[in-house]
Amino acid sequence: MAQPILGHGSLQPASAAGLASLELDSSLDQYVQIRIFKIIVIGDSNVGKTCLTFRFCGGTFPDKTEATIGVDFREKTVEIEGEKIKVQVWDTAGQERFRKSMVEHYYRNVHAVVFVYDVTKMTSFTNLKMWIQECNGHAVPPLVPKVLVGNKCDLREQIQVPSNLALKFADAHNMLLFETSAKDPKESQNVESIFMCLACRLKAQKSLLYRDAERQQGKVQKLEFPQEANSKTSCPC
């Protein structure tokens, strides 16, 4: 079973402006507030973006999928250290003709990014540079957490992208690398780890922002992520 591969890149706290946009869903009642973390999944068509979101949000692999047109999103409520958090996963189209009208919308107020490639298609890996450029070109703060995911690892005989090459790329772009399969039920825990890793980091960053804001009497400053913060969360990465 393929395991997540952790690169030397670290997930750093998002910018103060980005963190300030983390939303609260208070529609249930005045006593219950659920934070919403918006995570977008981007990459070439047919790399398995939709299947990854189905596996995480519903625990299933769809029998049949069609090319995503524009953007779609799925949600899953998770509990981290006693707090319920809604993880909103935005599944984006990989084809240019479906992206033009929606691209600004799904990059708006993003909290974390998942870049996906197909380990059996080298072109999907080489195109990652294009996706990163698009992300940067839409003013996504450079400190927004990002991870790299190599999907379809169940097709072991067809792998074209070696792990060491992917790890080198992830390190160069300050990302963690996960290799997994949305199709293989045995890999479901690894798919879960991708999104839970980001959710844990975002939760920790937001908590730090609140404490800093209180100390500064409402004045928000950029935060340095403390080394011990990782041990205080149930973060899988």
UniProtKB/Swiss-Prot annotation:
Keyword Phosphoprotein: no
Substrates-to-products reaction catalysed: GTP + H2O = GDP + phosphate + H(+)
Annotated positions of the Cysteine methyl ester modification: C237
Cofactor(s) this protein cannot do without: Mg(2+)
Sequence motif: Switch 2, positions: 92-111
Regulation: Regulated by guanine nucleotide exchange factors (GEFs) which promote the exchange of bound GDP for free GTP. Regulated by GTPase activating proteins (GAPs) which increase the GTP hydrolysis activity. Inhibited by GDP dissociation inhibitors (GDIs).
Example GO biological process: Rab protein signal transduction
Membrane topology: Lipid-anchor
Top-level EC class as recorded in UniProt: hydrolase
EC numbers, comma separated: 3.6.5.2
Domain of life per record: Eukaryota
The keyword Cell membrane is assigned to this record: yes
Motif (Switch 1): 59-71
Alphabetical UniProt keywords: Cell membrane, GTP-binding, Hydrolase, Lipoprotein, Magnesium, Membrane, Metal-binding, Methylation, Nucleotide-binding, Prenylation
PANTHER family xref list: PTHR47978
Family: Belongs to the small GTPase superfamily. Rab family.
Assembly behavior: Interacts with ATG16L1; the interaction is important for autophagosome formation.
Domain observations: Switch 1, switch 2 and the interswitch regions are characteristic of Rab GTPases and mediate the interactions with Rab downstream effectors. The switch regions undergo conformational changes upon nucleotide binding which drive interaction with specific sets of effector proteins, with most effectors only binding to GTP-bound Rab.
Protein name, per record: Ras-related protein Rab-33A
Organism field: Homo sapiens
Gene designation: RAB33A
